[in-house]
């Protein structure tokens, strides 16, 4: 019988056909657009973390709430928790010190300096994929142990801050003196979708160091925080692990000394867990049944907890005092001879064959063990460069303590951006080069000063294109992930930014603005650069018949060259900036995807990205002065011409060569080439979502709205690093 007959019969019985059958009709079920078109442009990445997902609302002020926190009482509660062993997850040696250090470490350790994404700054360990990564087994228990404290203090302390503070308190409770703690990490309420964790489809897929160099992600295997502790691809070879260790720690901005200190310091306390084979371990939190309530990795081996716990599958205790800080890691590393063995779970590890039984059992005081080490621990002894550092730390424990304190602080604060974002009573006074330090302000320009400066800029002979371009070049280095870059500091005038190809305009424009700064001595160069953009946009809007005052907030300062880490700032150089029609390499993603990436780093929404590109094109801000995307006969006028001409069916677009990167727009009737464009231009007509936005600004009644929206988005970018205004 046909489907039609089936439906007819159902209707004739009075039953609704849509209530029959077993198909999943819930929202979001079924085949999605990305199933049909897997290469679909990810415009949705620009819609993350909106107020619609934030239960606290847009008026919530975390810094204000934190100021109400009884910080001393919170630390006291955390200290008490460390020895309050719970039967559902008993503490090793009666202390959660090692567990909380690992939780903080693995939260921060996803950071990578190449794009500033990852890290502990938003409490992402609560969400997939990190909450269910193979390397994060049992950290769900650490977070549940913290819940009563989070519940007690509520919104006065974010999860993101609490995770790191718990690690700090654990170190302090072990007798270690930390470098300090800066709060200020604000929670988000959904997983980050923009972080590229890699292309692998299976957990623990090995990445060769050469591949890591081309795509510097945070780990050497999918699902790990750093490296495989059994060596690359479970090789069991300490020496072969050296390259992987350097690659992954280097991708976080760590040098060899910091790397050695972090590995040794992290392995001075606690243990790994590998009581039996991984086959006993159940589903991770995301895959666990609903009754598990977000807990995962339930073990069927013995009690499943305590002495029977399975986490990494390795069963290693490094030191004689696993809950107290010591130099035993290095002492044991060099004192004993190590032989390869296997854990009860079958994982490769090393045992000190000539050592007495000096390691306490975590649950039976009558038992002792020989010292054990991970494959990657022995790398610190057998790699020549790591060995030099390790022996120095062996012979100078104070140097080790200082190095670890600083490296731990860097690890846990690396993605927070400038020190101006830190809050709390334990913020260190010392400025550190990786914080991109800035000097104290020298100027407090008045409104009259600003008016006079604008007049001087307007009379300088600079074009609208030059003024707008130099301001964008200065501000657009900002990265929302780790809050680095931006206009404050005027680092556009310093190495390495002044020498980037994309910033060619700086060589022409900065000398003019520097002369104005010296002559007037009323504002910083950083402020004058941004003010030049203000002048350019106001002139362009006036030429379009719209009188508008572009908001300007003075107060920026000028960084010195010695406050600028050239190597680390080199990572901010864009491989593409679609706002300026710039692309340095064609072997990395598509031009339009890189435009989305840039917009996401600038925390822009899709409408903001759209209006900025359209406005910058008609203002002639292409990095090389080309006419690509300049769809107007009146450049320098802040018009909607980009959108109107892009969507005009009078033109037909065709690629100029097989690269499909550059296109010609020809008149359909005459065949005459009217415009040229890149993929960063044409995407606003080809992508259905972006075309819908472009159509808004192409309408005849959109001109005033366009100018206002452009100015609002522009000011947002100029002030992204003005944390003093936020």
UniProtKB/Swiss-Prot annotation:
Q: Could you say which residues are annotated as the site Transition state stabilizer?
A: 102
Query: What is one process in the GO biological process aspect for this record?
Result: cellular response to hydrogen peroxide
Modification after translation:
Formation of the three residue Trp-Tyr-Met cross-link is important for the catalase, but not the peroxidase activity of the enzyme.
Question: Tell me, what is one Gene Ontology molecular-function annotation carried by this entry?
Answer: metal ion binding
PROSITE patterns given for it? PEROXIDASE_1 (PS00435), PEROXIDASE_2 (PS00436), PEROXIDASE_4 (PS50873)
In this protein, the active site sits at 106
Tryptophyl-tyrosyl-methioninium (Trp-Tyr) (with M-252) crosslink - at what positions? 105-226
Q: Which part of the chain holds the cross-link Tryptophyl-tyrosyl-methioninium (Tyr-Met) (with W-105)? A: 226-252
Annotated keywords:
Heme, Hydrogen peroxide, Iron, Metal-binding, Oxidoreductase, Peroxidase
In its keyword annotation, does this UniProt entry include Oxidoreductase?
yes
Specify the signal sequence span: none
Q: What does this protein do?
A: Bifunctional enzyme with both catalase and broad-spectrum peroxidase activity.
Protein family (similarity comment) = Belongs to the peroxidase family. Peroxidase/catalase subfamily.
Identify this protein by name. Catalase-peroxidase
Protein's organism: Salmonella paratyphi B (strain ATCC BAA-1250 / SPB7)
**Gene designation per UniProt:** katG
């Amino acid at each position: 019988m046909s489907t039609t007959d089936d439906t007819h019969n159902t209707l004739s019985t009075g039953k609704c056909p849509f209530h029959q059958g077993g198909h999943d009709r819930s929202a979001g079920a079924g085949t999605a657009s990305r199933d049909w078109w897997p290469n679909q442009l990810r415009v949705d990445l620009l819609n993350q973390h909106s107020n619609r997902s934030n239960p606290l609302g847009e008026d919530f002020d975390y810094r204000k709430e934190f100021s109400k926190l009884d910080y001393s009482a919170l630390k006291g509660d955390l200290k008490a928790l460390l020895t309050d062993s719970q039967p559902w997850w008993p503490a090793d040696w009666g202390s959660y010190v090692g567990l909380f250090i690992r939780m903080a470490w693995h939260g921060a350790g996803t950071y990578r300096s190449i794009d500033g994404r990852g890290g502990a700054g938003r409490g992402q360990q609560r969400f997939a994929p990190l909450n269910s990564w193979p390397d994060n087994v049992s950290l769900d228990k650490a977070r549940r142990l913290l819940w009563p404290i989070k519940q007690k203090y509520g919104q006065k302390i974010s999860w993101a801050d609490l995770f790191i503070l718990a690690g700090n308190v654990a170190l302090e409770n072990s007798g270690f003196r930390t470098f300090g703690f800066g709060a200020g990490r604000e929670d988000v309420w959904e997983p980050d979708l923009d972080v590229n964790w890699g292309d692998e489809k299976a957990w623990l897929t090995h990445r060769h160091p050469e591949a890591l160099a081309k795509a510097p992600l945070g780990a050497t295997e999918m699902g790990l925080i750093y490296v495989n502790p059994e060596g690359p691809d479970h090789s069991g070879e300490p020496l072969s692990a050296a390259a992987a260790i350097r690659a992954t720690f280097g991708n976080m901005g760590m040098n060899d000394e910091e790397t050695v200190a972090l590995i040794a310091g992290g392995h001075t306390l606690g243990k790994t867990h590998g009581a039996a084979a991984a086959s006993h371990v159940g589903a991770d939190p995301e895959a666990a049944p609903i009754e598990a309530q977000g807990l995962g990795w339930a073990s069927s081996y013995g009690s499943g907890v305590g002495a029977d716990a399975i986490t990494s599958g390795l069963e290693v205790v490094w030191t004689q005092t696993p809950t107290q800080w010591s130099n035993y890691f290095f002492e044991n590393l060099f004192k004993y001879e190590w032989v390869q063995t296997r854990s009860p779970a079958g994982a490769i590890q090393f045992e000190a064959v000539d050592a007495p039984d000096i390691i306490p059992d975590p649950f039976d005081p009558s038992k002792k063990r020989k010292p054990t080490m991970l494959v990657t621990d022995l790398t610190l002894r057998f790699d020549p460069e790591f060995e030099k550092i390790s022996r120095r730390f062996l012979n100078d424990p104070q140097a080790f303590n200082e190095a670890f304190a600083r490296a731990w602080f860097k690890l846990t604060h690396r993605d927070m951006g400038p020190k101006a974002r830190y809050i709390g009573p334990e913020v260190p006074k010392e400025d550190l080069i990786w914080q991109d330090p800035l000097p104290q302000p020298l100027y407090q320009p008045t409104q009259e000063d600003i008016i006079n400066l604008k007049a001087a800029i307007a009379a300088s002979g600079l074009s609208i294109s030059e003024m707008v371009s130099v301001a964008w070049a200065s501000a657009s280095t900002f990265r929302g992930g780790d809050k680095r870059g931006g206009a404050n500091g005027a680092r556009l005038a310093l190495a390495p930014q002044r020498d980037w190809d994309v910033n060619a305009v700086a060589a022409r424009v900065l000398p003019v603005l520097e002369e104005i700064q010296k002559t007037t001595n009323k504002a910083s160069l950083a402020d004058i650069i941004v003010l030049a953009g203000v002048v350019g946009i106001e002139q362009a809007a006036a030429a379009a018949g719209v009188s508008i005052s572009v908001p300007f907030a003075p107060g920026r300062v000028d960084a010195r060259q010695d406050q600028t880490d050239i190597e680390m700032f080199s990572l901010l150089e864009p491989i593409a900036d679609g706002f300026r029609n710039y692309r340095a390499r064609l072997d990395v993603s598509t031009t339009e995807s890189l435009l989305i990436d840039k917009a996401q780093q600038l925390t822009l929404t899709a409408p903001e990205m759209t209006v900025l590109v359209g406005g910058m094109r008609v203002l002639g801000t292409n990095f090389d002065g080309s006419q690509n995307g300049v769809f107007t006969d009146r450049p320098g006028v802040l018009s909607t011409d980009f959108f109107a001409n892009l969507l005009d069916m009078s033109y037909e677009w065709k690629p100029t060569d097989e690269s499909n990167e550059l296109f010609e727009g020809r008149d359909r009737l005459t065949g005459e080439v009217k415009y040229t464009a890149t993929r960063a231009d044409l995407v606003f007509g080809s992508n259905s979502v972006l075309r819908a936005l472009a159509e808004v600004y192409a309408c005849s009644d959109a001109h005033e709205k366009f100018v206002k929206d452009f100015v609002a988005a522009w000011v947002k970018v100029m002030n992204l690093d003005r944390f003093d205004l936020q």
